[in-house]
């Protein structure tokens, strides 16, 4: 992937960048692997806003991704690399030798015509999936399961990867992208390689309209609201917060408060917390 830079013909184009989509080999998705999805604009079943700053955006079809990778010892050929509007990573269309088609996350370096497979004794190469207990120390992995058979939940965004550090009984030590070192059951599966489209984080939207295409609405600062809308609101002119520290819209402290329950059951599986966390 390379970053496409636009000439500053307008103010909106001045700082705009995008992907050149050089890796994409097919523009129309596989119809049998599509599902329709409705947008709720951040509202729940009562019609009340539960997530702010959402709404609008382009319609999208959901691509059914195989996160489980449990089709063992059946080889598949990479038929195409496609764009997926629902995630930052690209996806690969697989054609299995038994006629089944499936989408997977496209790892870095995967090309059309490559062979991938799943199982306990498959080769250690990008796109292959196997249990953590069979992956050598130091290998980069993604799409990691937290519960055997549930499907990959960790390390799925563009350019992300984790690393196998070692083994401890029934667990495998994995260092995640955040720097957190965590124990994961060795029977859980992961896919070899780094998630592709690694330069996605360098893309600059350049204008507000592209943000709206993604279904994201404008966000107002609390200090410009009325006092009945936000703890920072009210006052004459540019008034200070007026509190010992910044607050959330719901009156809770916004900084320095732990966002994870220290009594959570999985806390004992975390060997070292992520960077910046105590």
Curated annotation (Swiss-Prot):
Compositional bias per record (Basic and acidic residues), positions renumbered to this chain: 258-270
Keywords: Ribonucleoprotein, Ribosomal protein, RNA-binding, rRNA-binding
Composition bias, Basic residues: 210-219
Record-level Gene Ontology MF annotations: rRNA binding; structural constituent of ribosome; transferase activity
Keyword set includes Ribonucleoprotein: yes
Superkingdom classification of source: Bacteria
GO annotation, biological process: cytoplasmic translation
GO CC terms, sorted: large ribosomal subunit
RNA-binding recorded as keyword: yes
Region named Disordered: 210-278
PANTHER family in the cross-refs: LARGE RIBOSOMAL SUBUNIT PROTEIN UL2M, RIBOSOMAL PROTEIN L2
Task performed by this protein: One of the primary rRNA binding proteins. Required for association of the 30S and 50S subunits to form the 70S ribosome, for tRNA binding and peptide bond formation. It has been suggested to have peptidyltransferase activity; this is somewhat controversial. Makes several contacts with the 16S rRNA in the 70S ribosome.
Subunit organization: Part of the 50S ribosomal subunit. Forms a bridge to the 30S subunit in the 70S ribosome.
Family: Belongs to the universal ribosomal protein uL2 family.
Protein name as catalogued: Large ribosomal subunit protein uL2
Source species: Lactobacillus acidophilus (strain ATCC 700396 / NCK56 / N2 / NCFM)
């Amino acid at each position: 992937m390379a970053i496409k830079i636009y000439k500053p013909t307008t103010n909106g184009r001045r700082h705009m960048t995008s992907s050149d989509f050089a890796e994409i080999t097919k523009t129309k998705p596989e119809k049998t692997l599509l599902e329709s999805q409705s947008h709720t604009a951040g509202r729940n079943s009562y019609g009340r806003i539960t997530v702010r700053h959402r709404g609008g955006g382009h319609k999208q079809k959901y691509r059914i991704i195989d996160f489980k990778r449990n089709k063992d010892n059946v080889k598949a050929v990479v038929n195409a690399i496609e764009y997926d509007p629902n995630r930052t990573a690209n996806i690969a269309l697989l054609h299995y030798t038994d006629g089944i088609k499936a989408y997977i996350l496209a790892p870095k370096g995967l090309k059309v015509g490559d062979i991938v497979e799943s199982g306990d004794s498959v080769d250690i190469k990008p796109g292959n999936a196997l249990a953590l207990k069979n992956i050598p120390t130091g290998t980069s992995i993604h799409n990691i399961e937290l519960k055997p058979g549930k499907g990959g939940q960790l390390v799925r965004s563009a350019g992300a990867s984790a690393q196998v550090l070692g083994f401890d009984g029934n667990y495998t030590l994995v260092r995640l992208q955040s720097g957190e070192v965590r124990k994961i059951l060795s029977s859980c599966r992961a896919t070899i390689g780094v998630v592709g489209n690694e330069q996605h984080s360098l893309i600059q939207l350049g204008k507000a309209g592209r943000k709206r295409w993604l279904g994201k609405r404008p966000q107002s600062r609390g200090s410009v609201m009325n006092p009945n809308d936000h703890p920072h609101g009210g006052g004459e002119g540019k008034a200070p917060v007026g509190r010992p520290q910044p607050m959330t819209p719901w009156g809770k402290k916004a900084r320095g408060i732990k966002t994870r329950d220290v009594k959570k059951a999985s806390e004992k599986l975390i060997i070292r917390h992520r960077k910046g966390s105590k």
